[in-house]
Amino acid sequence: MGTLHHLINGEMVADNGRSADVFNPSTGEAIHKVPLADGKTLQKAIDAARAAFPAWRNTPPAKRAQVLYRFKQLLEQNEARISKLISEEHGKTLEDAAGELKRGIENVEYACAAPEILKGEYSRNVGPNIDAWSDFQPIGVVAGITPFNFPAMVPLWMYPLAIACGNTFILKPSERDPSSTLLIAELFHEAGLPKGVLNVVHGDKEAVDGLLQAPEVKAISFVGSTPIAEYIYAEGTKRGKRVQALGGAKNHAVLMPDADLDNAVSALMGAAYGSCGERCMAISVAVCVGDQVADALIAKLVPQIKALKIGAGTSCGLDMGPLVTAAAQAKVTGYIDSGVAQGAELVVDGRGYQVAGHENGFFLGGSLFDRVTPEMTIYKEEIFGPVLCVVRVNSLEEAMQLINDHEYGNGTCIFTRDGEAARLFCDEIEVGMVGVNVPLPVPVAYHSFGGWKRSLFGDLHAYGPDGVRFYTRRKAITQRWPQRASHEASQFAFPSL
């Protein structure tokens, strides 16, 4: 069983201190050890990033874009290799892993437009012989802390754009599935990224706290659970750091009586059970307007849930792999137990699911609850597993109130043929991302990603235009070149045109 390394100042750095096991969730076996950085190791990465910043910030944006474009090409050329690593350590299917990587590459493509997105604004003759302009300048050393569920995509939300903007970066990926993240960072260096511009440090809370406490780190981007997002936001902002912290979710799909039910069912199957439900944009609640809609939905869902193809993620032709860890498997099982105990109707039970030849894997089958109510734990909390809850309401207004009353506000969607209902829903619903006849309203790379309420801590969303704003500071410059042979008297009144 090999041990992974940190990537600091362009070099692989061994660490003989604390470590954690990385598991193959399909077999339950430990396959690697990942080092957990102490303060000394983290400081090496901070020092490397700090030393690299002056030269990188002064590198022309077009030169930065050339490195990013070569990086994009290398990612595409290594898709199969990266996808296999994701699947081995996370458990998601190879097809799902490849899709994750493709969405990440879209963010690299957006970052390749650095010469355009960093142009700033210019105004000539704002006053007599006075010109003014504003531009985007990098912050300095910035950091990202990323979750296990998208080991390729979420880091690619962060550091390509941060680096394109002229910053240097320290990435603390999830210790559960770090190999693909490390390989991708190596490919960035292969593309010509200078040493120290991107550093990868593995770790746990000690490393997180070190980044929060380091005065050299000017901004932190985080994706993960709400309690940790809240902690990172509070600890970072009280030290004067810029922080964007994306937290948990409880995403609802509203099904209207006029919905195309066959298309809605197909959408819900992928959104609820894809990646074993381990997505912050997973649909975990289906809100049916009317009993007739709910009954018809369940009748169509049940056979499809029971027919899900489940197995080792690296096998071909699957719908779903295992959960990421034994702890995750136990937690989701506990939620199913809770739903039964609190009176929800368990229509399909995924507990105890086993895959032949992989009896020690962290598998669950798809589960479906009906007649779930808002006071139940399975409705209130993020399950992060292959569990779909059906809630019955009598009107669109009741469905909207249900969603607006929930503490999370990440994403939601509505299935309807009624344009008036869809427009009302988009206007009045209190979440950050809305889909109309689209199950996973994940924006493309040139729009920003993020929720409302307790799904986001901070003022700016991830990637896209908000990403540029997060990783830069605006500087306004006013210059005057007096005409020759002229002298202007002192002006004591407030200057005006």
From Swiss-Prot:
| EC code(s) of this entry | 1.2.1.27
Induction info reads: Is subject to regulation by the transcriptional activator BauR.
Per the record, the GO terms for biological process are:
beta-alanine biosynthetic process; thymine catabolic process; valine catabolic process
Q: Quote one Gene Ontology molecular function term.
A: methylmalonate-semialdehyde dehydrogenase (acylating, NAD) activity
Q: Can you tell me which residues bind NAD(+)? A: F148, K172, E175, R176, S225, E382
The main enzyme category here is: oxidoreductase
Supply the SUPFAM superfamilies for this chain.
ALDH-like (SSF53720)
Per UniProt, the keywords (alphabetical) are: NAD, Oxidoreductase
Domain of life, source organism: Bacteria
Q: Which reaction does it catalyse?
A: 3-oxopropanoate + NAD(+) + CoA + H2O = hydrogencarbonate + acetyl-CoA + NADH + H(+)
Phenotypic effect of disruption: Cells lacking this gene grow normally on glutamate, putrescine, cadaverine, and GABA, but growth on beta-alanine is completely abolished.
Which InterPro entries does the protein's record reference?
Ald_DH/histidinol_DH, Ald_DH_C, Ald_DH_CS_CYS, Ald_DH_N, Aldehyde_DH_dom, MeMal-semiAld_DH
- Active site at C280 (nucleophile)
Q: What does this protein do?
A: Involved in the degradation of beta-alanine. Likely catalyzes the NAD(+)- and CoA-dependent oxidative decarboxylation of malonate semialdehyde (3-oxopropanoate) to acetyl-CoA.
UniProt lists the family membership as follows: Belongs to the aldehyde dehydrogenase family.
Protein name in the entry: Malonate-semialdehyde dehydrogenase
Which species expresses this protein natively?
Answer: Pseudomonas aeruginosa (strain ATCC 15692 / DSM 22644 / CIP 104116 / JCM 14847 / LMG 12228 / 1C / PRS 101 / PAO1)
What does the record give as the organism's lineage?
Bacteria, Pseudomonadati, Pseudomonadota, Gammaproteobacteria, Pseudomonadales
Supply the gene name: bauC
